[in-house]
């Protein structure tokens, strides 16, 4: 049974008209660690990828493909790496439902363009930071 209904698929296709280049979604799973969540995550990512010919999916096992996981900085499952022409460090842990789903879609578009959609003032403020910043957003299902 599909996760995305026809209305959601149409809305995502419309958003994906803004994709400017290829995007790879690297999914890390492990059937023993979180079988239901990993399966749901893989299905969702595959359904999303079917909505644009610019999106490819690679599914890796966290335990077997540990070198790739380490290279991406992934240490838990389920995980999604959103990668455009380069790796921008965009990661999703857990299945991105609800409001997080729209963030996944936006992240795919941002990764395809390489432009975060921030104002010049915000970009200047970020450039002034003395060190890298790791931003983490946590959410819980409601």
Mark where each language-model region is.
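Local sequence-structure signature of Cys/Sec-based thiol-disulfide redox active-site neighborhoods
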Residues: 8, 12-52, 127-142
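Structural micro-motif
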Residues: 22, 66-91
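Catalytic cores of nucleotide-enabled group-transfer and carboxylate-activating enzymes in metabolic
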Residues: 22, 59-61, 77-80, 111, ...
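Contiguous, structured surface segment used for ligand recognition
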Residues: 45, 69, 104
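Thiol-based oxidoreductase modules, predominantly thioredoxin-like and allied folds used
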Residues: 53-65
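Non-catalytic, surface beta->alpha helical segment in thiol-disulfide oxidoreductase systems
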Residues: 81-116
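Long, charged amphipathic helices and adjacent flexible linkers at domain junctions
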Residues: 111-129
């Amino acid at each position: 049974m599909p996760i995305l209904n026809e209305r959601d698929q149409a809305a995502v296709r419309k958003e994906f008209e803004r994709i400017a280049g290829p995007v790879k979604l690297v999914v890390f799973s492990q059937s023993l660690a979180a079988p239901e969540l990993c399966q749901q995550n893989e299905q969702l990512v595959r359904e999303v990828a079917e909505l644009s010919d610019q999106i490819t999916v690679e599914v890796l096992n966290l335990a077997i493909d540990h070198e790739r996981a380490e290279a991406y900085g992934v240490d838990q499952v389920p995980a999604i790496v959103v990668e455009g022409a380069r790796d921008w460090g965009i990661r999703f842990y857990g299945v991105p439902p609800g409001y997080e789903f729209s963030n996944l879609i936006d992240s795919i578009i941002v990764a395809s363009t390489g432009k975060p959609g921030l104002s010049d003032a915000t970009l200047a403020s970020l450039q002034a930071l003395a060190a890298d910043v790791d931003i983490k957003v946590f959410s819980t299902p409601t």
